[in-house]
């Protein structure tokens, strides 16, 4: 259910602010978003998988915290990321 190594490399390359950047909020939020989307597909088939649902909620919470942090630090980077990922805000 998690992202493959190649998928992670592609996402990191797309959202990295500099070469070798894996820890910026943009990269972390992008990885969490793609992981969350993949888990949502899993729940279409497995409605009663509550153990994985807890993990999903944890990832959503972590993404929310990172987005709040980025919004407080640099609103332009925040809005660009939200727009690029297609999140609701």
Curated annotation (Swiss-Prot):
Pfam families: Ribosomal_S15 (PF00312). The keyword RNA-binding applies. One of its GO terms (molecular function) is structural constituent of ribosome. This is Small ribosomal subunit protein uS15. SUPFAM superfamilies: S15/NS1 RNA-binding domain (SSF47060). One of the primary rRNA binding proteins, it binds directly to 16S rRNA where it helps nucleate assembly of the platform of the 30S subunit by binding and bridging several RNA helices of the 16S rRNA. The gene is rpsO. HAMAP family: Ribosomal_uS15_B. Keywords: Ribonucleoprotein, Ribosomal protein, RNA-binding, rRNA-binding. One of its GO terms (biological process) is translation. One of its GO terms (cellular component) is cytosolic small ribosomal subunit. The lineage of its organism: Bacteria, Pseudomonadati, Pseudomonadota, Gammaproteobacteria, Alteromonadales. Part of the 30S ribosomal subunit. Forms a bridge to the 50S subunit in the 70S ribosome, contacting the 23S rRNA. Belongs to the universal ribosomal protein uS15 family.
């Amino acid at each position: 259910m998690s992202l493959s190594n190649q998928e992670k490399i592609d996402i990191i390359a797309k959202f990295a602010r500099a070469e070798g950047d894996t820890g910026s909020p943009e990269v972390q939020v992008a990885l969490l978003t793609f992981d969350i989307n993949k888990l949502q597909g899993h729940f279409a088939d497995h409605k009663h998988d509550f153990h994985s649902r807890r993990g999903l909620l944890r990832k959503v919470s972590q993404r929310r915290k990172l987005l709040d942090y980025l919004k407080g630090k640099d609103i332009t980077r925040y809005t660009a990321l939200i727009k690029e990922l297609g999140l609701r805000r």
